[in-house]
């Protein structure tokens, strides 16, 4: 489908606006994936706060120019599906990783986080980042564990002191 200049400008403006507020981006090739499966992926993406769009590579190069996602330029080859994580840096990576497990033809090309290119082989680094709630829960568990351990050691020291006296 041929796009006129206004359509192209509108696409670049829309995706650029999303990219400005995004925490991370993941690029994938979805050739060979059925429409039903892609619809499921898009629905899961909306629920996870992930913006997904298939965009022409030339337009994507304009979108990422001068942004933290410029490192992805070399991955824009063939049909490109780009996903921006809006709420959590690992949301798109986690979504694509799970989808790729169930769909052999879906190929994650690369990701970008804070200006760093993350190759597909290391996408787990981004996908396994804990959410804010998970990080707080881990911190609280560690703090709780530490204070309980300290209390046990203090009580043991008091007991030992009483036994020695």
UniProtKB/Swiss-Prot annotation:
Which keywords appear in this protein's UniProt record, sorted alphabetically? Repressor, Ribonucleoprotein, Ribosomal protein, RNA-binding, rRNA-binding, Translation regulation
Q: Which Gene3D superfamilies match?
A: 3.30.70.1730, 6.10.250.2350
Q: Which GO terms describe its biological process?
A: regulation of translation; translation
Which GO MF terms does the UniProt record name? large ribosomal subunit rRNA binding; structural constituent of ribosome
The UniProt entry, under Pfam families, shows:
Ribosomal_L10 (PF00466)
This protein's source sits in the domain of life called Bacteria
GO cellular component entries: cytosolic large ribosomal subunit
* Family the entry assigns: Belongs to the universal ribosomal protein uL10 family.
Task: Provide the assembly information.
Answer: Part of the ribosomal stalk of the 50S ribosomal subunit. The N-terminus interacts with L11 and the large rRNA to form the base of the stalk. The C-terminus forms an elongated spine to which L12 dimers bind in a sequential fashion forming a multimeric L10(L12)X complex.
Relay the record's extra comment: Ribosomal protein L8 appears to be an aggregate of ribosomal proteins L7/L12 and L10.
What function does this protein fulfil?
Answer: Protein L10 is also a translational repressor protein. It controls the translation of the rplJL-rpoBC operon by binding to its mRNA. Forms part of the ribosomal stalk, playing a central role in the interaction of the ribosome with GTP-bound translation factors.
Q: What is the protein's name according to its record?
A: Large ribosomal subunit protein uL10
Q: Which species is this record about? A: Salmonella typhimurium (strain LT2 / SGSC1412 / ATCC 700720)
């Amino acid at each position: 489908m041929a796009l006129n200049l206004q359509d192209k400008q509108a696409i670049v403006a829309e995706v650029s606006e999303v990219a400005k507020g995004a925490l991370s981006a993941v690029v994938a090739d979805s050739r060979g994936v059925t429409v039903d499966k892609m619809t499921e992926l898009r629905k899961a993406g909306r629920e996870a706060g992930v913006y997904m769009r298939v965009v022409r590579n030339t337009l994507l190069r304009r979108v990422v120019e001068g942004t933290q996602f410029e490192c992805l330029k070399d991955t824009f080859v063939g049909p490109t599906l780009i996903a921006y994580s809006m709420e959590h840096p690992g949301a798109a990576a986690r979504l694509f990783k799970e989808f790729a497990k169930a769909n052999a033809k879906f190929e994650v090309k690369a990701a970008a986080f804070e200006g760093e290119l993350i190759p597909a082989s290391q996408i787990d680094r981004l996908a396994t980042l804990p959410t804010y709630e998970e990080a707080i829960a881990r911190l609280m568990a560690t703090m709780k564990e530490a204070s309980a351990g300290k209390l046990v050691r203090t009580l043991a020291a008091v007991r030992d002191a009483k036994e020695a006296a």
